Amino acid sequence: MRTLIQNGTVVTAQQYGAADILIKDEVILQVGENLSHQGVDQVIDAAGLLVMPGGVDVHTHLALPMFDTVSSDDHYTGHKAAAFGGTTTVMDFIPHDDHDLMPNIERWHRKAKGLAAVDYSFHMNISQFDESVLQQLEVLVEQGIPSAKMFTAYNRRMRLHDGEIFQVMRRCAEFGILPMLHAENGDVIEVLVQEAISAGHFEPVWHARTRPAWGAAEAVFRGIAIAVQAGSPLYVVHMNTAGGVDQLANAKSKGIPIFGETCPPYLFFTEEDLARPDGAKWVCSPPMRSEEDQKRIWESLEEGIMDTVGTDHCPFFFDGTTPIEYEGEWIAIPGKELGKDDFRKIPNGLPGVGDRMPVLWTTAVNTGRISPQRFVALMSTNPAKLFGMYPQKGAIQVGSDADIVLWYPEKTLNYGV
């Protein structure tokens, strides 16, 4: 099957200009101007449209168990949302429930089997530690899993201590595995949560007030320092503080291989949204920050400091007691109402995989804050490079997968919620 996309404007991380694209069997065969129709089975006229590599969202949580419920998107519904918004590759996180890594990997493959609507891959959480876990990290390479995520928060649940993180990073460096870090100060959070509860503060806004921005900034610096000592690169997930951005910029200025990701909610919402009557909708970790932090995150996108925009897509029903109709079936999954009397019990997470690209195009490209090429870099090319998918993903060039988005730059979309 040969398909020709003609008359479009091709946008990549480096280029912007007119070109046709010839595809054979889902792979790009040729890129150039005025390509021949000879032997072509299908012609797509992209006049007036932008032609971009499909989005790569490297931060999603699908069918994730949490607080006696599960996130409301599985691989089928989550992938459909991704495709609707122009994302053609997603990466999900495998929880480290069983001590040995392989049973967890096999379980997540079973969860996704037969449900995928786009290409997908996995990261591995490392939330238990001993010598055997270190030895098993080689399994990730064998299974094609390019990355391992660790946490400096969630004491007694997922957190690793600094020496353990150091050892995992050092082992990752041996195998070319990219360490990822959820950077908050778990000890400070634990103290502040107990103080809030003792004072009778159970409202959603206290989720944010007990997870301070400077604790996150400190943990970013600590993660960078540990990575340098371990001789390892580091990818810091869902960055949302001014102090964290400053640490990222400083490390990059010294040539340290540190990479940063932010997420759309941190560009548009603040801690004050959690003080609303429906504030549970905005509960995620790390939480929404101040307008000052938000301003610095925007600057990091504009100045080339931030490397990617993921979503941390992890949606929950706001009221799981009220069913909704989806594809002819009525569905109700316990959600944010589980924490209506205690912020500690609110399932953490927001949606985003379907609207990441349209929202950022509208607010960042159409407003002139970033260029179309920078948009493609953030949404597709950079994540593909960092997680071993480039140039199969994140590129429009001969030999790349034909994961191509035809983009209507002025189109208006209405999202139902």
Show which residues each predicted segment covers.
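Histidine-rich, glycine-flanked metal-binding segment
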Residues: 1-53
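Divalent metal-coordination and catalytic microenvironments
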Residues: 8, 26, 48, 59, ...
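Metal-associated gating/positioning segment near the N- to mid-region
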Residues: 46-115, 132
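Short acidic/polar active-site loop segments enriched in Thr and Asp
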Residues: 87-89, 118, 146, 307
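Short catalytic-loop micro-motif centered on adjacent basic/acidic residues
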Residues: 90-92, 121-124, 233-238
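Histidine/acidic residue-rich metal-binding segments in metalloenzymes
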Residues: 132-309, 314-317, 325-330
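Alpha-helix-loop-beta-strand connector modules within alpha/beta enzyme cores
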Residues: 102-118, 166-181
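His/Asp/Glu-enriched, well-ordered alpha-helical/loop segment
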Residues: 202-231, 282, 315-411
